[in-house]
Regions:
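Intracellular loop-helix junctions on the cytosolic face of multi-pass helical membrane proteins
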Residues: 1-25, 117-130, 153-291, 305-307, ...
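Helix-to-loop junctions at the C-terminal end of transmembrane segments
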Residues: 76-95, 188, 324-341, 426-427
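Transmembrane alpha-helix termini and helix-breaking/packing motifs in multi-pass membrane transporters
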Residues: 84-87, 117-119, 177-197, 330-331, ...
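C-terminal ends and interior cores of transmembrane alpha-helices
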Residues: 100-123, 347-364
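Transmembrane alpha-helices of Major Facilitator/SLC transporters
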Residues: 72-79, 312-335, 345, 349-352
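C-terminal transmembrane helical hairpin of 12-TM major facilitator-type secondary transporters
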Residues: 340-390
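Helix-loop boundary and gating motifs at the non-cytosolic
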Residues: 13-73, 274-281, 285-299, 303, ...
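A late C-terminal transmembrane helix in Major Facilitator Superfamily
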Residues: 394-428
């Protein structure tokens, strides 16, 4: 099994090296930059998008439904194999397989953000929905390329490095979503043109991201194509024994290795029962956080906080604490093992949502608002780093984009598609935010039960990196 062999071959010197020294690795700078790029689209179609629609007078249910365009993130596994196999004319030849696809996707996000600045939800929501869907499609494609870039840059043969990469990419993601998002909120509340000016600002940030990707990031080295060619040759040989015509056998072999082999390899390596359990855990783990996160900004506004207060607390302070907690979470998860990290952070993530229930009962209180954001950021950082490391270690180096995209898509399913009903739920609860956040608290329970049930099989698969017998 490729992942097991990689872990078994992990360099010994890393174990004796202080974890913080791993962050001096230049590769982590590249990963942070791409993490920032991955998080940026959520500055456009996340909280800013929800509050923009709320300011335009749309109902909570409508905001939740419009936000469901983000379900495209849960579908990117459908075209992820193309990023492993298809070479874009000129782009991939000039910049490499990973960077070529990333640049194309980033150009799409930039164009979509400019278009968003020209739309008006008070005139009609159809154009808004189409532009948002275009942005999300570009962002979802970018995510596939970025995740593959990260795993190929620091592979499973460097388990501590991969854990550090998970922390850095998560810190970059929150920086990309938080800092530009805070700037957008501030501009929307103070600058002439309001949200249109804010979206123009976000388009400028995206343009800078494209320039950095273009000029400074190297293409990762990988023997992916050689392994894929071997798999394709085996399929052609099997087809030749059945006397399949040469041209047809070439097409069938290419399709098999592109669309079927990544998933067949994953099931063969883990077994069908464990595969289904892993995907079930991934879907369920962050569903409570997804429901809460979709409506958080709307909740802040309804409670009476201004755009500037949201930008200061949820944006700037939230970004600083989240980035710090992400790096700390990397250290904690390496010392405790991914299993304990997922289990403890899952419980803490649920309890943090109770703070929002209290906040709903107390009313607009800046101190409580700040405490809620810090508590939520700590648990989110802890769980996100463990979660990213978990699915990274499960990913084959041969089919990086395809396999990671499937698992990430399952996680995005709860964050996007299932959470589309969050606004409807608040409406059905007669606007009771306290009850809504209480319900999100208990949503994580099924995933933790499932994780406990499959822990032994995962330990056999991943070893000490997943479940340390003694936390260090």
């Amino acid at each position: 099994m490729q992942t097991d062999r990689a872990l078994a071959a992990a360099p010994e010197e890393a174990e004796g090296q202080p974890f913080w020294k791993l962050f001096a690795d230049r590769r982590l700078i590249y990963i942070f930059i791409l993490g920032f790029a991955s998080g940026f689209p959520w500055a456009v179609i996340g909280n800013a998008f929800s509050v923009w629609l709320s300011d335009a007078g749309l109902t909570r249910t409508s905001i939740g439904v419009l936000g469901s365009v983000t379900m495209i993130f849960a579908l990117n596994f459908l075209w992820a194999p193309l990023l492993d196999r298809v070479k874009l004319p000129w782009l991939c030849r000039r910049f490499g397989q990973r960077r070529g696809w990333i640049l194309l996707a980033q150009a799409g996000v930039f164009i979509g953000t400019l278009a968003m600045a020209a739309t008006d939800p008070t005139v009609g929501v159809t154009a808004v929905a189409l532009v948002a869907a275009f942005i999300v499609f570009g962002a979802a494609t970018q995510d596939v390329g970025i995740d593959a870039y990260r795993i190929e840059t620091i592979p499973a043969s460097e388990p501590r490095g991969m854990a550090a990469a998970a922390a850095v990419t998560a810190a970059g993601w929150w920086s990309g979503a938080g800092l530009p998002g805070a700037g957008a909120f501030w501009i929307a509340g103070t600058a002439p043109g309001g949200w249109s000016t804010a979206f123009h600002f976000l388009a400028l940030v995206m343009a800078l991201i494209v320039i950095v990707t273009l000029l400074f990031l190297p293409e990762p080295e990988s023997d992916r194509e050689a392994h894929q060619a071997e798999d394709e040759a085996r399929v052609r040989e099997a087809l030749s024994k059945r006397r399949t015509p040469g041209r047809l056998s070439t097409v069938v072999a290419w399709f098999t290795v592109t669309a079927i082999a990544p998933f067949a390899e994953f099931v063969r390596r883990n077994g069908l029962k464990l595969t289904v359990s892993i995907l079930g855990f991934i879907v369920l783990f962050k569903i409570g956080e997804a429901f809460m996160g979709r409506m958080a900004a709307v909740f802040y506004r309804e409670l009476g906080f201004t755009h500037q207060e949201i930008a200061l607390v949820s944006g700037l302070m939230g970004w600083f604490t989240m980035t710090l907690f992400m790096l700390l979470a990397g250290i904690i998860n390496v010392r405790m093992g991914i299993f304990r990290g997922l289990l403890i952070s899952g419980v803490a993530m649920a309890l943090a949502n109770l703070v929002y229930s209290v906040m709903a009962l107390v009313g607009p209180n800046m101190a409580l608002f700040a405490f809620a954001v810090v508590a939520d950021n700590f648990t989110t950082a802890f769980s996100t780093v463990a979660f990213v490391a978990f699915i990274s270690f499960l990913t084959s180096q041969v089919y990086t984009a395809s396999q990671y995209a499937v698992m990430a898509s399952m996680g995005n399913l709860s964050r996007t598609s299932l959470a589309a009903g969050s606004g409807w739920m608040v409406d059905m609860l007669a606007g009771s935010w306290a009850m809504f956040f209480f319900i999100t608290t208990i949503m994580v329970t099924p995933s933790l039960v499932l994780l406990w049930w499959i822990r032994k099989q995962l330990y056999e698969q991943l070893g000490e990196v997943f479940y340390k017998r003694k936390a260090t």
